[in-house]
A protein has these predicted regions:
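H-loop/switch region of ABC-family ATPase nucleotide-binding domains
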Residues: 40-41
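ABC ATPase "signature
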Residues: 64-65, 73
Length: 193
């Protein structure tokens, strides 16, 4: 056959069996040149073996492309929600009121930038304190997508320079107020329940 269709082929399997099935499918693709169309709700499977991905909503493809590109820079609201659920913000909501004063920033990295020591370098260069509230790095093949939620504390020009340096060295920079952080954290808690 030219195409092998797998519909939720790993959804009810244990981890070891899933790994075996995925390794077999990769070998079939590589050695026999057979295209594999794999339908799944499991992002772990998608990030591990897919070259390309199509995101569907109500039976319609809403976004498609290279797996890393689609998940590192989602365009459609459905894809954005899927990636947000997967990468998610996991700061416990009860922690937020006790955080010290400072600027809360969501930083997103992709590719090699996710592996650079930006946080420690900015803290050292500008004399600010940067506390990591949440961190997640996921690999899509050999390419990384990272998300950090940090609390940057300092004053005056050094603080502004530190924030600007962070802004210019990441793929996505977004300042969050404490209310946004609580809502995001509670949403993450609800999805895990």
């Amino acid at each position: 056959p030219e195409i092998l269709l797998c519909d939720e082929a790993t959804s009810a399997l244990d981890l070891e069996t899933t790994e075996g099935i995925l390794a077999l499918l990769q070998r079939i693709n590589r050695e026999l040149g057979i295209t594999i169309v794999f339908i799944t709700h499991q992002l772990d499977v998608a990030k591990q073996i897919f070259d390309r991905v199509a995101v569907m909503e109500n039976g319609v493809v809403v976004e498609q492309g290279n797996t890393f590109d689609v998940f590192s820079a989602p365009k459609h609201p459905t894809t954005k929600a899927l990636v947000e659920r997967y990468l998610g913000i996991a700061v416990p909501p009860q922690l937020v009121p006790s955080l010290p004063a400072g600027t809360i920033v969501e930083l997103r990295y992709k590719g090699d930038a996710a592996l650079e020591p930006l946080i420690s370098q900015v803290a050292q260069d500008y004399g600010v304190s940067i506390d990591v509230l949440h961190a997640n790095v996921e690999y899509f093949g050999s390419q990384a997508i990272g998300i950090l939620i940090v609390l940057v504390s300092g004053a005056g020009e050094p603080l502004l320079q530190a924030l600007n340096t962070l802004r210019t060295h990441v793929f996505s920079y977004r300042e969050l107020d404490r209310g946004q952080l609580v809502v995001a954290a509670e949403a993450a808690d609800n999805q895990e329940a």
